């Protein structure tokens, strides 16, 4: 009887200590798809932690960075570039986990790649043949839609801003595919996941002209106003998400991501990205 009364009292006290957290992410796809994909993850975090996690999809990468800097969000899903630059600017930023995916060989991996692609009917078989064509990046803050493609161009001694007739920034990876399909552009930079989704949707109509080196997948971070202990508690919850969890299925269903959960790496896992910052064209060409 005493034990039951004690347990009941604990249940009554839980709401007093439960916290409400804001979890932000960037618009890599249409916001409605991102909300559908991440809502089960928010529900999982809320159920496992006893706290409430509310999802925010920012307008763009810049807004996400700004909100992390001003601590108006508690947790955030950030891309590789965001993480490296934010960590340099805010050393107290807490790294939690790295996103995992099933590769095309069905192995679980913390990496992905950037592709530069064209349509087969464009009859372009190499980057050099794409001179004076219309090209699209996604966003200057994108890892696979800008940073790593710029490394590819540097390796080929190509300045995209003078090599192509016109360069566009279409913000989202699926918008690059749409522009290719409508022949508004002849060549574009996208993530490998976007390419494989397009392959399933439109068939074998694309040619990969160049492939980047492996890129560390996105990270989840906690802002500086979250304690180290709390960060580790949430990281553990993320690490232990089952493979068959609704959150993983939602990523597959709404974004086409072959999600495999999360893993805790050393934050220096992302140091390889720093080489992209040394590409001359990367920061100097506007």
Task: List each language-model region with its residue ranges.
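Acidic, polar ligand-binding/catalytic clefts
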Residues: 66-129
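Extracytoplasmic small-molecule ligand-binding "clamshell" domains
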Residues: 19-89
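Hydrophobic h-region of N-terminal signal peptides that target proteins for export
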Residues: 10-18
């Amino acid at each position: 009887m005493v034990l039951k009364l004690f347990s009941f009292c604990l249940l009554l006290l839980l709401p007093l200590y439960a916290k409400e957290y804001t979890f932000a992410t960037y618009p890599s796809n249409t916001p409605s798809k991102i909300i559908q994909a991440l809502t089960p993850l928010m529900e999982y975090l809320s159920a496992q932690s006893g706290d409430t996690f509310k999802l925010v999809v920012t307008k763009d990468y810049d807004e996400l960075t700004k909100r992390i800097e001003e601590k108006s969000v508690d947790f955030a899903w950030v891309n590789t570039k965001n993480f490296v630059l934010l960590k340099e600017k805010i050393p107290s930023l807490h790294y939690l986990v790295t996103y995992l995916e099933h590769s095309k060989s069905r192995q679980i991996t913390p990496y992905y790649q950037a592709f530069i692609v064209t349509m087969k009917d464009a009859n372009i078989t190499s980057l050099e043949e794409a001179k004076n064509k219309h090209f699209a990046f996604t966003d200057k803050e994108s890892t696979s839609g800008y940073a790593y493609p710029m490394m590819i161009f540097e390796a080929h001694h190509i300045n995209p801003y003078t090599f192509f007739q016109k360069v566009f920034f279409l913000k989202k990876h699926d918008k690059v595919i749409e522009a290719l399909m409508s022949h508004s552009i002849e060549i574009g930079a996208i993530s490998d996941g976007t390419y494989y989704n397009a392959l399933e949707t439109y068939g074998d109509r694309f040619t990969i002209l160049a492939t980047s080196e492996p890129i560390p997948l996105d990270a989840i971070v906690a802002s500086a106003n979250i304690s180290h202990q709390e960060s580790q508690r949430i990281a553990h919850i993320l690490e232990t998400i089952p493979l068959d969890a609704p959150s993983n299925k939602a990523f597959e269903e709404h974004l086409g991501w072959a999600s495999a959960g999360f893993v805790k790496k050393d934050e220096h896992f992302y140091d390889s990205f720093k080489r992209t910052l040394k590409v001359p064209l990367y920061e100097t060409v506007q």
